Regions:
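A short acidic/basic microdomain associated with nuclease active sites
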Residues: 90-106
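Short aromatic-glycine-enriched beta-strand elements
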Residues: 16-21
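Conserved catalytic cores of phosphodiester-cleaving nucleases, focusing on short active-site segments
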Residues: 9, 110-140, 153
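Short nucleic-acid-contacting surface segments enriched for D/E, G, S/T with interspersed K/R
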Residues: 37-50
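OB-fold/S1-family single-stranded nucleic acid-binding modules
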Residues: 56-72, 215
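Nucleic-acid nuclease catalytic cores
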Residues: 134-144, 154-183, 205
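Short, charged beta-turn/beta-strand-edge "cap" motif at the junction between a beta-strand
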Residues: 13, 53-58
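Domain-level recognition of nuclease-like catalytic cores that cleave nucleotide substrates
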Residues: 170-221
């Protein structure tokens, strides 16, 4: 996926999880942050960020903050909606007979349901923006929703579904995502239980720029 109307600015601060202040053309601009996670290790004062201009003239904020530059890594996409969009693009190239997003299973909505050759698939997607010493980690904040999804996938695989949890790595040069035990031990435990049950973990490497996120060729199911 590629963004249009991208503009580079400098990050100033983040008063709350929904908005940030940036310096754009010498002026302070309030922008919407398309990620409600903490992202404290990314959003540092004077860091370069990528903004997408909204085409809605009635919005209070004119821009969405979608990417941030990290020294030693490059551009990181931090748009929380982007992982599902690029996975949908990618799944369409995988020869499935049927793909349905937002599939209701049990008490949850799982990101994707697919069918191919009489096999039923479920896939939950998680975006990874946290990097420590060359390794990606998820989550960057406690996620009870993430734990719930893993438990649903564990149930599903025992019912005969082929199940995946796909970590979309929203930065270049990283090819592994590990559970962030320190931040959310319960998620790490649920991930291990899911893997033991037969849920497959995908580490989807990406090409990333200030204005794009795409799953690289070579990633397989």
């Amino acid at each position: 996926m590629k963004y249009s109307n991208i503009t580079e600015a400098k990050f100033i601060d983040r008063p709350n999880r929904f908005i940030a202040h940036v310096e754009l053309d010498g002026k302070t601009e309030t922008v919407h942050v398309k990620n409600t996670g903490r992202c404290k290790e990314l959003l540092l004062t004077n860091t370069a960020v990528g903004l997408v201009k909204s085409d809605n003239p009635d919005r209070k904020t004119k821009y969405d903050l979608v990417s941030v530059y990290k020294k030693g890594i490059g551009w990181i996409n931090m748009d929380s909606q982007a992982p599902n969009q690029v996975v949908m693009e990618w799944l369409k190239t995988r020869s499935f007979d049927y793909i349905k997003p937002e599939y209701v299973f049990g008490d949850s909505r799982i990101d994707f349901y697919m069918e191919k050759d009489q096999t039923q698939y479920l896939m939950e997607v998680k975006g990874c923006t946290l990097e420590i010493d060359g390794v990606g980690y998820f989550p960057d904040a406690p996620t009870e929703r993430g734990v719930k999804h893993l438990r649903e996938l564990t149930k599903a695989v025992r019912q005969g579904y082929k199940c995946y949890i796909a970590f979309v790595i929203q930065m270049e040069g990283i090819d592994e995502v590990r559970p962030n035990e320190q931040t959310h031990k319960e998620f790490a435990e649920a991930l291990r239980e899911a893997e033991t049950a037969g849920v497959e973990v995908l580490h989807l490497t990406c090409g990333v720029g200030i204005d794009e996120l795409r799953i690289l060729e070579g990633n397989t199911l």
